[in-house]
Amino acid sequence: MKVRKGDTVLVISGKDKGAKGKVLVAYPDRNKVLVEGVNRIKKHTPESRTERGASSGGIVTQEAPISVSNVMLLDSDGKPTRVGYRRDDETGKNVRIAKSNGKDI
C-alpha cells in the first residue's frame, strides 16, 4: 500500500469528495485508511465502554476507515499525485517519489 500513517491525502470519490486530511491509521491487510475528519459516522456505545473520541457512552461521532482507492496522496506542492518508487543509492532502500514532480515524499 502506497499510503502510510502521517501522509496528507485528498478524497477523490464518495460522500466526502474533495476533503483533505491526515492519515491517522493505515490498514494494509484491509486496503483501508483512517483519515482525520473524513467518513464520520455516529456510533452508539454503552456507558461502560470508551471509544475513540469519547470518554463515556452515548452516541459518538468518529471517523471510519475509507478505501485506499478513494484517496490520493498530496505531494509537497499540495497537488494530488500518483506514487512511484526508486532505490536510494546510499542506503539501498526503496524511497517513495511523487509521479507529478519527481520529488521524494
Swiss-Prot record:
Q: Does the keyword Calcium apply?
A: no
Q: Which UniProt keywords apply?
A: Ribonucleoprotein, Ribosomal protein, RNA-binding, rRNA-binding
Annotated GO biological processes are:
translation
Record's Pfam families? KOW, ribosomal_L24
Quote the InterPro entries the UniProt record gives.
Answer: KOW, Rib_uL2_dom2, Ribosomal_uL24, Ribosomal_uL24_CS, Ribosomal_uL24_KOW, Translation_prot_SH3-like_sf
Q: Does the keyword RNA-binding apply?
A: yes
Please give the Gene Ontology molecular function terms for this protein.
rRNA binding; structural constituent of ribosome
Mind naming one GO cellular-component term on file for this protein?
ribosome
Organism superkingdom: Bacteria
**PROSITE patterns per record:** RIBOSOMAL_L24
Write down the Gene3D superfamilies for this protein, in alphabetical order.
2.30.30.30
Q: How does it assemble?
A: Part of the 50S ribosomal subunit.
Question: What is this protein for, i.e. what is its function?
Answer: One of two assembly initiator proteins, it binds directly to the 5'-end of the 23S rRNA, where it nucleates assembly of the 50S subunit.
* Family from the record: Belongs to the universal ribosomal protein uL24 family.
Indicate what this protein is called per its UniProt record: Large ribosomal subunit protein uL24
In its UniProt entry, the species of origin is given as Mycolicibacterium vanbaalenii (strain DSM 7251 / JCM 13017 / BCRC 16820 / KCTC 9966 / NRRL B-24157 / PYR-1) (Mycobacterium vanbaalenii)
